[in-house]
Amino acid sequence: MIAKLKGILDSITDSYLIIDINGVGYQVYSSGKTLMKLIKEEGSIVSLFIETHVREDRIHLFGFLDNTEKVAFNMLQSVSGIGTKMALHILSNLTPHQLQIAISSQNRHQLKAISGVGPKLIDRLMIELRDKVANINTIANNTSLAILSTDSNTHDNILSDAITALIALGISRAEATQILSDIYALFPSISVNELVRTALQRRAK
């Protein structure tokens, strides 16, 4: 399960973006608000929280700049009749905070202003999310901490495996640690094999 992606923002369309990670392009669907924020970042390194949906014939990735929007996205889909497309459509018009306020205050007008959101859907949103929206920030913060912990563990494992590989080739631990740390700092998405290969190439120069 992909929870986060970090790579070069290759291109943006009106409904999705493509992130290039080591030559592999990942198509990631996002809300209009997220796409607008990233439109000036093409060619730069970006990081997105990811929600992965696996179907029989395909895998869909949905990306968010912050975990609060990801939580709101999943919360919206818990409402009867709302799928991924409508959830992104709502978040293209309202931020998670605006959505939270609209439902908490039972502000139907704010939701009614969104095209495709009719009275029956508004009723379901008000009823089914009324007791949930207050927890958006808490859930987002807890999930972010878990992802940060996972990222840290992944970083440590990659470096540790690469160091072990270089030591097996007769390179001292101190030298292996130094050269691998330098490379990993420049290429945080690199795999163990690529990290070892790059280290050997750099050492041979």
Swiss-Prot record:
Cell location: Cytoplasm
The organism's place on the tree of life at top rank: Bacteria
GO cellular component, one term: cytoplasm
One Pfam family this sequence matches: RuvA_C
Region Domain III, residue ranges: 154-205
Region (Domain I): 1-65
One of the protein's GO biological processes: DNA repair
GO molecular function, one term: ATP binding
Family matches, as Gene3D superfamilies: 5' to 3' exonuclease, C-terminal subdomain (1.10.150.20), DNA helicase RuvA subunit, C-terminal domain (1.10.8.10), Nucleic acid-binding proteins (2.40.50.140)
Main location: cytoplasm
UniProt-listed InterPro entries: DNA_helicase_Holl-junc_RuvA_I, Hlx-hairpin-Hlx_DNA-bd_motif, NA-bd_OB-fold, RuvA, RuvA_2-like, RuvA_C, RuvA_C_sf
Annotated region described as Domain II, given as residue ranges: 66-144
This protein's record includes keyword tRNA processing: no
UniProt entry keywords in alphabetical sequence: Cytoplasm, DNA damage, DNA recombination, DNA repair, DNA-binding
Annotated region described as Flexible linker, given as residue ranges: 145-153
Record's keyword annotation contains Cytoplasm: yes
UniProt family annotation: Belongs to the RuvA family.
Main function: The RuvA-RuvB-RuvC complex processes Holliday junction (HJ) DNA during genetic recombination and DNA repair, while the RuvA-RuvB complex plays an important role in the rescue of blocked DNA replication forks via replication fork reversal (RFR). RuvA specifically binds to HJ cruciform DNA, conferring on it an open structure. The RuvB hexamer acts as an ATP-dependent pump, pulling dsDNA into and through the RuvAB complex. HJ branch migration allows RuvC to scan DNA until it finds its consensus sequence, where it cleaves and resolves the cruciform DNA.
Cross-referenced NCBIfam families: ruvA
Domain remark in the UniProt entry: Has three domains with a flexible linker between the domains II and III and assumes an 'L' shape. Domain III is highly mobile and contacts RuvB.
Subunit structure and binding partners: Homotetramer. Forms an RuvA(8)-RuvB(12)-Holliday junction (HJ) complex. HJ DNA is sandwiched between 2 RuvA tetramers; dsDNA enters through RuvA and exits via RuvB. An RuvB hexamer assembles on each DNA strand where it exits the tetramer. Each RuvB hexamer is contacted by two RuvA subunits (via domain III) on 2 adjacent RuvB subunits; this complex drives branch migration. In the full resolvosome a probable DNA-RuvA(4)-RuvB(12)-RuvC(2) complex forms which resolves the HJ.
Protein name per its UniProtKB record: Holliday junction branch migration complex subunit RuvA
